[in-house]
A protein has these predicted regions:
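M16 family metallopeptidases and their MPP-like homologs
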Residues: 68-101
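Non-catalytic beta-strand/loop surface segments
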Residues: 1-29, 60-73, 77-81, 136
Length: 150
């Protein structure tokens, strides 16, 4: 079998940030790396799950909603993938920054966190999710579209 593209990224050199991971036709895959790989600090499952619900809800209700294909966590718990169509790198970055601001400040019930709406609704940790989003925000806010490469 061929090695998939995400396994071709040298994780020993990868740091926190936002990167264009790949382009498949008109779909761009963004690597939103919240944790340095293999350094022992990972997103907890509760924080990652909560961030997933908040990020997906915000992105799919934003001005960029028609360009959002998918938002989801990495299995290694070091970040998220954002798949977009028709958004420029600057727009994808703006969407990500706005999403992280939303998540860092979120108060209330986590969207989709009920037995009817989610397959593991009890595994949520809003305080941890907010802290993780707040910790990532300064890094994202300092980026420009020209910085979004490995």
């Amino acid at each position: 079998m061929e090695r998939i593209a995400s396994f071709c990224v040298d994780h020993t050199r990868l740091d926190r940030g936002m990167y264009l991971s790949r382009q498949d036709g008109d779909v761009l895959t963004w690597d939103i790396r919240m944790k340095k790989p293999n350094h022992g600090d990972y997103l907890s499952t509760g924080a990652a799950h909560t961030l997933e619900h908040l990020f997906a809800t915000y992105a799919r209700n934003s001005q960029y909603k028609d360009g959002v294909v998918y938002v989801g966590p990495m299995g290694c718990r070091t970040g998220f993938y954002l798949l977009t169509r028709g958004l420029t790198p600057a727009e994808a970055l703006r969407l990500t920054v706005e999403s992280f601001r939303f998540m860092a400040a979120f108060e209330g019930d986590v969207p989709g966190a009920s037995e009817v709406e989610c397959g593991n609704y009890r595994d949520m940790d809003l305080p941890a999710a907010k802290a993780e989003a707040a910790a990532m925000l300064p890094l994202l806010e300092a980026l420009t579209a020209d910085d979004l490469h490995y």
